[in-house]
Curated annotation (Swiss-Prot):
It comes from Rhodococcus opacus (strain B4). GO terms for molecular function: ATP binding; metal ion binding; NAD binding; NAD+ kinase activity. The lineage of its organism: Bacteria, Bacillati, Actinomycetota, Actinomycetes, Mycobacteriales. This is NAD kinase. The gene is nadK. It holds the Pfam family NAD_kinase. It is an enzyme of class 2 (transferase).
Amino acid sequence: MSGGSSGGQQREREILLVAHPGRAEITETARRVGKIFERAGIGMRVLVDEVDSTRIEPMDGMAADEFLVPGLEVTIVQAGPDAALGCEMVLVLGGDGTFLRAAELAQAASIPVLGINLGRIGFLAETEAEHLDEALGQVVRREYRIEHRMTLDVLVRVDDEIIERGWALNEASIENRSRLGVLEVVLEVDGRPVSAFGCDGVLISTPTGSTAYAFSAGGPVVWPELEALLVVPSNAHALFARPLVTSPESLIAVETVAGSHDGLVFCDGRRTLELPAGARVEVVRGKEPVRWVRLDSAPFADRMVRKFELPVTGWRGRKP
């Protein structure tokens, strides 16, 4: 069907496009992607706007009329658990926020996600906009590999009753709901109490999330090949409130003190869970990973230096 249509026969290969909305250069890039896939006989679905009240912000996508281009055939879909079903992958045009939106859809369909950075740092993206044609060529030829990134499963208990469930790719951030005063918590690891303290919040992160919010809060950078859980207190009022790195099989629990403030749990900064005073948050390794499209084998150190523009002048390296 022609651009903007929403029905038709599904092709053997189909890719879901999730793009940051509202920027002319991204719209033009998205159309370019569509034309390349059209020539290769690959169908393209395009995510359009849909508001979901359980999210902090809408699941933004392209407007349908942005693909009204003669000769360009796309399928318009709305955000939801079935948006990516049957697709080969989810392709992202944008920054890390757009990638995290797309990761929800990719995880729900158990398919990989490929990020093309059109944002600022874009740490989650696999490649930059200037390498778009090369990246799409590899996709067309199926010259890519898939890497599994661990996730977090999150639940909230009140008196042993589970009242909320969620998941995260980067981090679960436990915060004071009112942002006034101090959130009093007790940290538990594998069924044993570790420390009680007042704080602005507690971050529980994956290695993938170690370069995101946890990094800003003073946590360590963890190579994605290493499977672990990170616990990073935020502005804690305690002598011992250091970042911790635990086994990926650990159960991390944070109990809010009864009579303290109500809180919220932010999953990837996108999905919220209610946290009444006296409730308990439990975080474990997620059952369902996010599948990552890798186009090259560049070391993580090179990616980190490039994304953060780290100075390496004076490095000599080991002589062969």
